[in-house]
Design a protein with these regions (language model features):
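Bacterial Sec-dependent signal peptides at the C-terminal "C-region" and cleavage site
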Residues: 1-2, 6-20
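Non-catalytic cell-wall polysaccharide-engagement segments
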Residues: 14-42, 50-148
Length: 148
Protein backbone atom coordinates (compact mmCIF):
# COMPACT_ATOMS: atom_id res chain seq x y z
CA UNK A 1 0.00 0.00 0.00
CA UNK A 2 1.39 3.38 -0.91
CA UNK A 3 0.69 6.56 1.05
CA UNK A 4 -2.06 8.89 -0.07
CA UNK A 5 -1.07 10.17 -3.53
CA UNK A 6 0.84 13.41 -3.72
CA UNK A 7 -1.91 14.81 -5.97
CA UNK A 8 -4.46 14.52 -3.17
CA UNK A 9 -2.14 16.30 -0.73
CA UNK A 10 -1.42 19.05 -3.24
CA UNK A 11 -5.14 19.55 -3.77
CA UNK A 12 -5.51 19.89 0.00
CA UNK A 13 -2.69 22.41 0.32
CA UNK A 14 -0.21 20.18 2.21
CA UNK A 15 -1.32 21.61 5.57
CA UNK A 16 0.03 19.91 8.68
CA UNK A 17 -3.41 18.44 9.42
CA UNK A 18 -3.62 17.14 5.85
CA UNK A 19 -0.27 15.37 6.29
CA UNK A 20 -1.39 13.94 9.65
CA UNK A 21 -4.66 12.80 8.11
CA UNK A 22 -2.75 11.19 5.23
CA UNK A 23 -0.74 9.15 7.76
CA UNK A 24 -3.94 8.10 9.54
CA UNK A 25 -5.60 7.10 6.27
CA UNK A 26 -2.52 5.17 5.18
CA UNK A 27 -2.74 3.23 8.46
CA UNK A 28 -6.50 2.69 8.06
CA UNK A 29 -5.90 1.39 4.54
CA UNK A 30 -3.33 -1.09 5.83
CA UNK A 31 -5.55 -2.34 8.64
CA UNK A 32 -8.57 -2.58 6.33
CA UNK A 33 -6.69 -4.94 4.02
CA UNK A 34 -4.57 -2.79 1.74
CA UNK A 35 -6.43 -3.32 -1.53
CA UNK A 36 -7.97 -0.48 -3.55
CA UNK A 37 -10.40 -2.79 -5.35
CA UNK A 38 -11.69 -4.66 -2.32
CA UNK A 39 -15.33 -4.98 -1.37
CA UNK A 40 -16.23 -5.86 2.18
CA UNK A 41 -19.20 -6.12 4.47
CA UNK A 42 -21.36 -7.81 1.86
CA UNK A 43 -20.37 -5.28 -0.80
CA UNK A 44 -21.34 -2.24 1.30
CA UNK A 45 -17.76 -1.23 2.17
CA UNK A 46 -15.65 -0.30 -0.84
CA UNK A 47 -12.05 0.42 -1.64
CA UNK A 48 -8.85 0.78 0.31
CA UNK A 49 -10.55 2.48 3.25
CA UNK A 50 -13.67 0.25 3.22
CA UNK A 51 -16.08 3.19 3.09
CA UNK A 52 -19.77 2.49 3.54
CA UNK A 53 -22.33 4.57 1.59
CA UNK A 54 -22.99 6.83 4.60
CA UNK A 55 -19.29 7.58 5.08
CA UNK A 56 -18.88 8.28 1.35
CA UNK A 57 -21.86 10.67 1.49
CA UNK A 58 -20.41 12.40 4.58
CA UNK A 59 -17.06 12.80 2.83
CA UNK A 60 -18.75 14.29 -0.22
CA UNK A 61 -20.79 16.64 1.98
CA UNK A 62 -17.52 17.85 3.52
CA UNK A 63 -16.04 18.42 0.06
CA UNK A 64 -19.09 20.47 -0.89
CA UNK A 65 -18.83 22.54 2.33
CA UNK A 66 -15.24 23.28 1.32
CA UNK A 67 -16.27 24.33 -2.18
CA UNK A 68 -14.73 21.24 -3.77
CA UNK A 69 -16.23 18.86 -6.30
CA UNK A 70 -17.69 15.65 -4.86
CA UNK A 71 -17.05 12.20 -6.29
CA UNK A 72 -20.05 10.02 -7.15
CA UNK A 73 -19.91 6.62 -5.46
CA UNK A 74 -19.68 4.88 -8.83
CA UNK A 75 -16.14 6.36 -9.04
CA UNK A 76 -15.05 4.37 -5.98
CA UNK A 77 -12.40 2.47 -7.97
CA UNK A 78 -10.50 5.70 -8.66
CA UNK A 79 -7.57 6.13 -6.26
CA UNK A 80 -8.04 9.90 -6.35
CA UNK A 81 -11.76 9.60 -5.53
CA UNK A 82 -11.04 7.16 -2.69
CA UNK A 83 -8.35 9.41 -1.21
CA UNK A 84 -10.19 12.71 -1.58
CA UNK A 85 -13.48 11.39 -0.16
CA UNK A 86 -11.71 9.55 2.67
CA UNK A 87 -9.63 12.61 3.60
CA UNK A 88 -12.77 14.75 3.55
CA UNK A 89 -14.59 12.22 5.74
CA UNK A 90 -11.71 12.33 8.21
CA UNK A 91 -11.97 16.14 8.30
CA UNK A 92 -15.71 15.81 8.93
CA UNK A 93 -15.02 13.42 11.81
CA UNK A 94 -12.47 15.87 13.25
CA UNK A 95 -15.08 18.64 13.05
CA UNK A 96 -17.68 16.54 14.85
CA UNK A 97 -15.19 15.59 17.53
CA UNK A 98 -14.20 19.23 18.02
CA UNK A 99 -17.88 20.12 18.41
CA UNK A 100 -18.04 17.44 21.16
CA UNK A 101 -15.08 19.00 23.00
CA UNK A 102 -12.34 16.78 21.53
CA UNK A 103 -10.29 19.24 19.42
CA UNK A 104 -7.17 17.05 19.12
CA UNK A 105 -8.35 13.45 18.81
CA UNK A 106 -5.80 10.66 18.90
CA UNK A 107 -5.38 8.38 15.90
CA UNK A 108 -7.12 5.70 17.99
CA UNK A 109 -10.14 7.94 18.57
CA UNK A 110 -10.37 8.73 14.86
CA UNK A 111 -10.00 5.03 14.03
CA UNK A 112 -12.84 4.17 16.42
CA UNK A 113 -15.03 6.75 14.67
CA UNK A 114 -14.02 5.29 11.30
CA UNK A 115 -14.69 1.71 12.33
CA UNK A 116 -17.83 2.17 14.43
CA UNK A 117 -19.20 5.26 12.71
CA UNK A 118 -19.41 8.54 14.62
CA UNK A 119 -22.65 7.62 16.38
CA UNK A 120 -21.28 4.23 17.40
CA UNK A 121 -18.09 5.76 18.76
CA UNK A 122 -20.09 8.44 20.59
CA UNK A 123 -22.25 5.74 22.19
CA UNK A 124 -19.13 4.36 23.93
CA UNK A 125 -17.81 7.79 24.86
CA UNK A 126 -15.07 7.62 22.22
CA UNK A 127 -13.15 5.36 24.65
CA UNK A 128 -11.13 2.31 23.66
CA UNK A 129 -11.88 0.75 27.02
CA UNK A 130 -15.60 0.77 26.20
CA UNK A 131 -15.21 -0.64 22.68
CA UNK A 132 -15.74 -4.29 21.76
CA UNK A 133 -12.37 -6.07 21.74
CA UNK A 134 -12.10 -6.36 17.95
CA UNK A 135 -12.93 -2.67 17.48
CA UNK A 136 -10.43 -1.60 20.15
CA UNK A 137 -7.78 -3.80 18.52
CA UNK A 138 -8.48 -2.15 15.15
CA UNK A 139 -8.00 1.32 16.66
CA UNK A 140 -4.79 0.31 18.46
CA UNK A 141 -3.35 -1.17 15.25
CA UNK A 142 -4.13 2.07 13.38
CA UNK A 143 -2.50 4.12 16.15
CA UNK A 144 0.61 1.92 16.14
CA UNK A 145 1.00 2.27 12.37
CA UNK A 146 0.57 6.05 12.54
CA UNK A 147 3.36 6.30 15.11
CA UNK A 148 5.82 4.10 13.19
Amino acid sequence: VSPVPIVALLLLGCAANAQSDARILHAIGQVEGGERGQRGDGGAALGLYQMHPEAWADGNAQLLREGREPFPRWQWRSPLAQDMVALAYLRALRGRLTARGIPNPSPECLALCWNLGFTGAASIGFRLSNAPAARASYAVRVGNLVRR
